């Protein structure tokens, strides 16, 4: 595991063309713009957590895959490759890549919806940053579902051969994130009192950047 401040190509184990993409993404805004342009990984073959190399090749990603790519790009430019996990109740967790500017936290995020996106570096603490996702983070039953956030996890603690240069799913990353200390955002009493999304919010929440492709029926299938 490398503890270098700046990642070289050989540290990540990527090819020249792959590394060149990360070299071009030299600001958090450029990284976020790149993630916006990646299509959504709808996991047609089942649950996936594909390394950076596979995401660069496939040109699609979901949240943790985008967060790993963003963290790799930050590391290439001398910033620590930090992830933060947000736990939800009866809902999917969300993972973002963290960065700081003048002591304030921001987040780079890959999502297919309107809400759990980029956050400008204006948050004094990770709790503040996580709370910025609180109101819109809702499950399919329209209940606000965000409950916890984690300490930053430094991806340099895991061999880049697993999460950057690998070809197989990097399940060690979410497993290690699960072990990181998490902090509650609301008490149980507060959680019970949270309101559901109103009808207008539900309409907005239905907006998606990329539509799930329809499965093509083979000839003769029913």
State what each model feature region is.
Residues 1-222:
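A structural boundary/capping signal
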């Amino acid at each position: 595991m490398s503890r270098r401040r700046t990642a070289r190509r050989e540290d990540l184990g990527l090819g020249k063309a792959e590394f060149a993409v990360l070299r071009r993404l030299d600001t958090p805004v450029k990284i976020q713009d790149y993630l916006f342009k990646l299509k959504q990984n709808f996991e047609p073959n089942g649950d996936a957590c594909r390394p950076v190399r596979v995401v660069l090749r496939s040109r699609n990603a979901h949240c943790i895959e985008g967060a790993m790519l963003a963290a790799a790009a930050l590391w290439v430019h001398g910033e620590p490759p930090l992830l933060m996990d947000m736990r939800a109740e009866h809902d999917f967790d969300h993972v973002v890549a963290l960065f700081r500017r003048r002591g304030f936290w921001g987040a780079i995020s890959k999502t297919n919806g309107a809400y759990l996106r980029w956050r400008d570096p204006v948050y004094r603490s990770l709790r503040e940053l996580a709370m910025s996702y609180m109101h819109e983070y809702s499950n399919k039953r329209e209940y606000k579902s965000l409950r916890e956030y984690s300490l930053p996890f430094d991806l340099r603690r895991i061999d880049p051969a697993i999460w950057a240069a690998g070809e197989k799913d990097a399940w060690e990353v979410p497993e290690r994130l699960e072990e990181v200390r998490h902090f509650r955002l609301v008490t149980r009493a507060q959680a019970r009192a949270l309101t559901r999304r109103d009808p207008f919010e539900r309409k907005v929440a239905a907006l998606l950047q990329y539509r799930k492709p329809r499965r093509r029926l083979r000839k003769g299938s029913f």
